[in-house]
From Swiss-Prot:
This is UDP-N-acetylenolpyruvoylglucosamine reductase. PROSITE patterns: FAD_PCMH. Pfam families: FAD_binding_4, MurB_C. The keyword Oxidoreductase applies. The keyword Cell wall biogenesis/degradation applies. GO terms for biological process: cell division; cell wall organization; peptidoglycan biosynthetic process; regulation of cell shape. Belongs to the MurB family. Gene3D superfamilies: 3.30.465.10, UDP-N-acetylenolpyruvoylglucosamine reductase, C-terminal domain, Uridine Diphospho-n-acetylenolpyruvylglucosamine Reductase, domain 2. One of its GO terms (molecular function) is FAD binding. Disulfide bonds: none annotated. It comes from Pseudomonas fluorescens (strain Pf0-1). The active site is at residues 166, 239, 335. It comes from the Bacteria. GO terms for cellular component: cytosol.
Length: 339
């Protein structure tokens, strides 16, 4: 057996909140064979299997009575290249930001707006990660996943993934699909997305009038570094709440009290609000209780100042949800998966 299964392993190094809970069993998968072995092991020992990636979208509230399998497979390869459009495939365990930097170094554009997002390649399609006007669905060329119900491999097209805002079929059917590798359609001729004001502004400040994809990536990295704390320094899971979608009527109600509210019209007629703005306006920015808090610079980020438990962070999140619902009649949804 090549899979190394260890009992009673602390998951503190494997979640970016730095919450110290234990896995009943723990293993790392470096290949498809390891994944199948883990499935067989969990079945034979009658324990659940919980698959994790970089741990940047996890809130762990108790010890995990399961085999926790961390995807650690590596590998990046070009699948097709017609001179401009390049399809590149990466294994699920590849760290996301270094993968983005690799594609840029090869002269491929498309992922630059998704720079410095924590996590792994395999986790990216789960919630259709997005930033600065680009989502995974915009560069998606397919993926291969293992059906945990049948043990069969299946290739997914864009349509089959059912991507939506921070959502996908993989999130809608938790525990069924185990993503093994993902393919992206990138280009040598750049089509830059500079719709977001802060990105254009940063490039202008740097005196860059005709930016390259690498310039855009660097600008976004500098913006994100200023706004978001480094999980290696201060435990966090990035944006903790989704930006809520509400009706025009709700927007009108809030604007009556808060004329400076900014709302973004969506194709389906709904309006998207900035969750961070709502939380800050409600007075939570910089709040701290024991070691659980709201970041002092970015109200959308909950932080662990050292010894916060998952339950303390969850309690804080739920209090914020309750307050925002009562103040603004808006329901905030948590982004991290909770266990």
């Amino acid at each position: 057996m090549s899979l190394q299964v260890q009992p009673q392993v602390s998951l503190k190094p494997f979640n970016t909140f730095g919450v110290d809970v234990r896995a009943q069993l723990f293993a790392e998968a470096h290949s498809d064979a390891d994944v199948r072995e883990a499935l067989a092991y969990a079945s034979a020992h009658d324990v659940p299997l919980l698959v994790i990636g970089g741990g940047s979208n996890l809130l762990l509230t108790a010890d995990i009575p399961a085999l926790v399998l961390r995807m650690a497979s590596r590998g990046i390869r070009v699948i097709s290249d017609d001179g401009n459009r390049v399809v590149i495939e990466a294994e699920a365990g590849e760290p996301w930001h270094p993968f983005v930097q690799h594609t840029l170094a090869q002269g491929f554009s498309g992922l630059e707006n998704l720079s410095l997002i924590p996590g792994t390649v395999g986790a990216a399609p789960m919630q259709n990660i997005g930033a600065y006007g680009v989502e995974i669905k915009d560069v998606f060329a397919g993926l291969t996943a293992l059906d945990r119900q049948t043990g069969e491999l299946r290739d997914f097209s864009l349509e089959e993934c059912r991507f939506a805002y921070r959502d996908s079929v993989f999130k809608q059917q938790p525990g069924r699909w185990l993503i093994l590798r993902v393919r992206f359609a990138l280009n040598r001729v750049a089509h830059l997305h500079l719709e977001y004001g802060p990105v254009r502004q940063r490039l202008t400040e740097q005196g860059i009038e005709q930016p390259t994809p690498t310039d855009v990536s660097r600008a976004i990295c500098s913006i994100r570094s200023e706004k978001l704390p480094d999980p290696a320094v201060l435990g966090n899971a990035g944006s903790f709440f989704k930006n809520p979608l509400v009706s025009a009527a709700v927007v009108a109600q809030i604007k009556a009290q808060h004329p400076d509210l900014v709302a973004y019209a969506q194709p389906d007629g709904q309006m998207k609000l900035a969750a961070g703005w709502l939380i800050e306006r409600a007075g939570w920015k910089g709040f701290r209780e024991a070691d659980a808090g709201v970041h002092k610079l970015q109200a959308l980020v909950l932080v662990n100042y050292g010894a916060a438990t998952g339950l303390q962070l969850l309690d804080l999140a739920q209090r914020i949800q309750k307050d925002i619902a009562e103040r603004f009649n808006v329901e905030l949804e948590m982004e991290p998966n909770r266990y």
